[in-house]
Amino acid sequence: KKALHLFVNDAIGFGMESEMELKFSDNCFGTADAISFKDGVLRIHDLKTGMSKVSFRQLDVYTAMFCLEYRHTPHSIDIVHRIYQGRDFMETSPNPDDILEIMELMIEFDPVIERMKSVV
């Protein structure tokens, strides 16, 4: 319950939007729990209610979709990721090169998926 309270209070405090859909294409989309982009800082927060080990990879993917959708390069913005779980949160700033790599994969494989869909 503590992480939920922290998550809600921080989302309000940072002026974040909740449940925002990010979409690169019909094949590549997702919903960020809380997100904001202000003064060159992209902030994405995720709430995990389970107790299993978490990874920031999902937030990296959301960041890549944000950059593609809104035409930003990950090197030109600051990025802050938070995952709330249990009684606390973890925070990181991903390497922009990692985000760029995800963006390149999305660009490369989206047309492949489209072609596969037309064959099925």
Regions of interest found by a model, annotated:
Residues 57-65:
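Short amphipathic alpha-helical face segments that pack within enzyme cores
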Residues 47-53:
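Short beta-strand-loop-alpha-helix junction that forms the active-site gateway
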Residues 111-120:
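Accessory terminal regions of nucleic-acid processing enzymes
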Residues 45-47, 83:
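Compositionally biased, intrinsically disordered low-complexity segments enriched
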Residues 4-6, 47, 62:
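Broad hydrophobic/π-residue packing in well-ordered secondary structure
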Residues 78-85:
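Extended hydrophobic secondary-structure segments that form protein cores and membrane-embedded regions
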Residues 1-43, 54-57, 69-76, 89-106, ...:
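Catalytic cores of nuclease domains that cleave nucleic-acid phosphodiester backbones
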